[in-house]
Amino acid sequence: MNYLPLAPPGMTPPRVLSIAGSDSGGGAGIQADMRTMALLGVHACVAVTAVTVQNTLGVKDIHEVPNDVVAGQIEAVVTDIGVQAAKTGMLASSRIVATVAATWRRLELSVPLVVDPVCASMHGDPLLAPSALDSLRGQLFPLATLLTPNLDEARLLVDIEVVDAESQRAAAKALHALGPQWVLVKGGHLRSSDGSCDLLYDGVSCYQFDAQRLPTGDDHGGGDTLATAIAAALAHGFTVPDAVDFGKRWVTECLRAAYPLGRGHGPVSPLFRLS
């Protein structure tokens, strides 16, 4: 595949801000985001929303970052360094969702924003308070350039169980009605299919992205990696459909390069680009 260009030595690369939680096991969250950004030629900036105590077996505890610290990190980055795109991951609670949305509006940010509505870990551990769903729908989604829910998240957000292409389109349309410019309903969790079909919708047209389903249990951080790769491509100037196409191909290669770690699920790995 064609990679995003790396800036020549001494030249400032595009910057992307990840607003997300920290994963002590290093498989997902801001740790996964920063790995992907570095290998896609962008400078990674972060605003940590929560510190998780987790490993490959699951999430043991979550410690939320205070509102003023979340807002302060975002403001410190964008008012000095500047960013060409941003993405959100784990936001943990309604107060953090509200803080991120209010800060985005107050700073009048207009760069592409990829919202990955993280609700639970791959083990099923909750990463978002149920009360925060309304905050996501009402405050953050209208700011999003692209919303990237998986099938479980789509069900929680719009109460549509995706079981086939028709229900996937219905979920995309219902999610788009909540305000994002584009919606990508990821089909990787649809186990009845031999492949992985993601559906991109802009309110008018649907775009389908198919990929081979890879037989690996080491897929921790796949959703984070996809959203971050899309944000990196947007920072490089890609259109949304082209950024999604790139992100899909990137995460497929990361799945091929995934490695075992600990006693649970290992992470997807962008380190193949170094070989």
UniProtKB/Swiss-Prot annotation:
One matching Pfam family is: Phos_pyr_kin
Please give one Gene Ontology molecular function term for this protein: hydroxymethylpyrimidine kinase activity
InterPro entries per UniProt: HMP/HMP-P_kinase_dom, PM/HMP-P_kinase-1, Ribokinase-like
Whether 4Fe-4S counts among this entry's keywords is no
The lineage's top-level taxon is: Bacteria
Its UniProt entry gives the catalysed reaction(s) as: 4-amino-5-hydroxymethyl-2-methylpyrimidine + ATP = 4-amino-2-methyl-5-(phosphooxymethyl)pyrimidine + ADP + H(+); 4-amino-2-methyl-5-(phosphooxymethyl)pyrimidine + ATP = 4-amino-2-methyl-5-(diphosphooxymethyl)pyrimidine + ADP
Functional pathway: Cofactor biosynthesis; thiamine diphosphate biosynthesis; 4-amino-2-methyl-5-diphosphomethylpyrimidine from 5-amino-1-(5-phospho-D-ribosyl)imidazole: step 2/3; Cofactor biosynthesis; thiamine diphosphate biosynthesis; 4-amino-2-methyl-5-diphosphomethylpyrimidine from 5-amino-1-(5-phospho-D-ribosyl)imidazole: step 3/3
The family annotation for this protein states: Belongs to the ThiD family.
Instruction: State what this protein does.
Output: Catalyzes the phosphorylation of hydroxymethylpyrimidine phosphate (HMP-P) to HMP-PP, and of HMP to HMP-P.
Tell me the protein's name.
Hydroxymethylpyrimidine/phosphomethylpyrimidine kinase
Q: Which organism is it from?
A: Mycobacterium tuberculosis (strain ATCC 25618 / H37Rv)
